[in-house]
């Protein structure tokens, strides 16, 4: 899936490519010399991230000749290995997320990033040397997938609700989300079965799952951290409007205290 701006004159410009290689998706951005986002792509990797990397780079380089590419940087779980394969520069994903948030949204003081296999809380402060924000502190989830996007994916498959769009829209219909265990997928499944037996409406169960993930994040990743406002919510899960609602309510965020970046899935790249 691509998000493309007006095509620049490739004969007179040079570009940078950023790649975030995760367990679920490959996120690619093309930047110009002024760090403007020219194009960005979100591709599901389907268990073959390096095959998708090859296909995406081939596609980009057909449009933007290699002579115009000044640099390639990579991050994510597959970033270090891929950097060795294609000769790019590997960047730690905490640094990548903090840098993009600090440059594009300098007023943000907390970053919540939830991807397919991990979740992060990043604290920022204003850098007195420029107009950007800089990294102060961070925390990540444990090895358990309960606080990540895969938690929602697993539960969505169990109740046969497409995760891409319908899941979030369905959650927004709920006015009484039931409490569902969010710390363990096994317990969540048990709670879901229980609520189905009670004839709890499906949209309420879906909303309950969103709130379960948000509460799990608050009580684990953010348990010892102050969540300063405004909060920037990035990662693929930020596309889920049910999760946006859940974080607003769980963290008591009003109006512009919660920022959803236009390129929320590609912030790491």
Named regions from a protein language model:
Residues 5-34, 108-128:
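Gly/Thr-rich phosphate-binding beta-strand-loop-beta motif of the actin/hexokinase/Hsp70
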Residues 13-58, 132-138, 142:
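Short glycine-rich, Thr/Ser-proximal phosphate-binding strand/loop in the N-terminal lobe
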Residues 33, 41-45, 60-95, 122-123:
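Short beta-strand-loop/turn "lid" adjacent to the catalytic site in phosphate-handling enzymes
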Residues 48, 126, 134-172, 262-265:
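Glycine-rich phosphate-binding loop plus the immediately following alpha-helix
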Residues 57-70, 217-229:
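Phosphate/pyrophosphate-binding loops at sites that engage ATP/ADP/AMP, CoA/4′-phosphopantetheine
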Residues 78, 223-250, 260-265:
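Glycine-rich phosphate-binding loops at beta-strand->alpha-helix junctions
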Residues 166-204:
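A mobile "lid/hinge" subdomain adjacent to the ATP/sugar-phosphate binding pocket shared
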Residues 190-219, 262:
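Adenine-nucleotide phosphate-binding core of ATP-dependent small-molecule kinases
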């Amino acid at each position: 899936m691509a998000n493309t701006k007006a095509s620049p004159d490739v004969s007179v410009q040079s570009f940078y490519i950023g790649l975030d290689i995760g367990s679920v998706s490959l996120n690619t951005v093309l930047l110009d010399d002024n760090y403007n986002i020219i194009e960005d792509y979100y591709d599901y990797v389907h268990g073959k991230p390096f095959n998708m990397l090859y296909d995406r780079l081939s596609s980009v380089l057909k449009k933007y000749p290699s002579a115009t590419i000044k640099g390639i940087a990579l991050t994510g779980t597959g970033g270090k290995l891929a950097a060795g394969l294609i000769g790019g520069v590997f960047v730690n994903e905490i640094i990548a997320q903090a840098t993009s948030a600090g440059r594009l949204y300098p007023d943000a003081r907390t970053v919540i990033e939830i991807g397919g296999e991990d979740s992060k809380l990043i604290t920022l402060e204003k850098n007195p040397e420029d107009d950007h924000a800089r990294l102060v502190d961070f925390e990540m989830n444990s090895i358990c997938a309960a606080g990540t996007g895969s938690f929602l994916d697993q539960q969505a498959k169990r109740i046969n609700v497409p995760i891409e769009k319908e899941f979030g829209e369905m959650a927004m219909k709920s006015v009484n989300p039931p409490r569902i265990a969010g710390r363990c997928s096994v317990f969540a499944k048990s709670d879901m079965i229980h609520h189905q037996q009670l004839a709890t409406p499906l949209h309420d169960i879906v909303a309950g799952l969103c709130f379960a993930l948000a509460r799990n994040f608050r009580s684990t990743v953010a348990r010892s951290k102050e969540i300063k406002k405004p909060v920037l919510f990035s990662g693929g899960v930020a596309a889920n409007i049910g999760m946006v609602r859940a974080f607003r309510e769980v963290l008591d965020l009003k109006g512009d205290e919660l920022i959803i970046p236009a390129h929320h899935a590609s912030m790491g790249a």
